[in-house]
């Protein structure tokens, strides 16, 4: 039922003319991410790298009671459109979310949470920094682990914090659930 709900909602919620097209493979990617949130039903969540809010919407469909803190510097060429789209999704779907518009690399700490989604800076240093920002969060979902720099950051983070990562390939990208 959750998978179908996401398959129905995402295409309608997609930003018009987004360079990142919504297709069946992309929908499966968001379904895989939402399944992690559905399994744990967090009260609070942190999302580093929220962009247009597609993951946030998928997480909301999986766990509508979760309160989210989203962090994004919105520094790309399409960032203003993405930010406005994010605001519309949050309002339209009544998502409990607050945003910090800041480059996560400028942060030294974030509040406690039950779940974190790390999908911000995809450089090794940026991904590792973001993971350390949420090091005390019990379950971390790291996206884009098919990117060698991100995967290495996840592996090094897990080695230094004595945590485990379960890597999965959703057909579009590789995800890591860190516990």
Task: Please describe what each predicted stretch is.
Residues 19, 31-179:
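S-adenosylmethionine/decaboxylated-SAM
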Residues 2-40:
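Class I SAM-dependent methyltransferase Rossmann-like catalytic core
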């Amino acid at each position: 039922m959750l998978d179908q709900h996401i398959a129905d909602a995402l295409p309608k919620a997609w930003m018009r003319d987004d360079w990142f097209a919504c297709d069946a493979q992309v929908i499966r990617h968001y379904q895989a991410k939402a399944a992690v949130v559905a399994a744990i039903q967090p009260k609070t969540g942190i999302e580093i790298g929220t962009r247009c809010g597609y993951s946030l919407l998928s997480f909301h469909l999986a766990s509508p009671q979760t309160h989210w803190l989203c962090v994004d510097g919105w520094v790309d060429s399409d960032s203003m459109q993405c930010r406005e789209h994010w605001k519309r999704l949050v309002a339209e779907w009544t998502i409990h979310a607050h945003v910090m518009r800041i480059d996560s690399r400028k942060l030294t700490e974030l509040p406690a949470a039950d779940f974190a989604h790390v999908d911000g800076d995809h450089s090794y240093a940026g991904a590792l920094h973001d993971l350390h920002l949420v090091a005390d969060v019990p379950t971390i979902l790291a996206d884009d682990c098919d990117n060698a720099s991100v995967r290495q950051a996840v592996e090094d983070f897990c080695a230094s914090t004595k945590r485990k990562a379960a890597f999965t390939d959703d057909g579009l990208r590789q995800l890591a659930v860190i516990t």
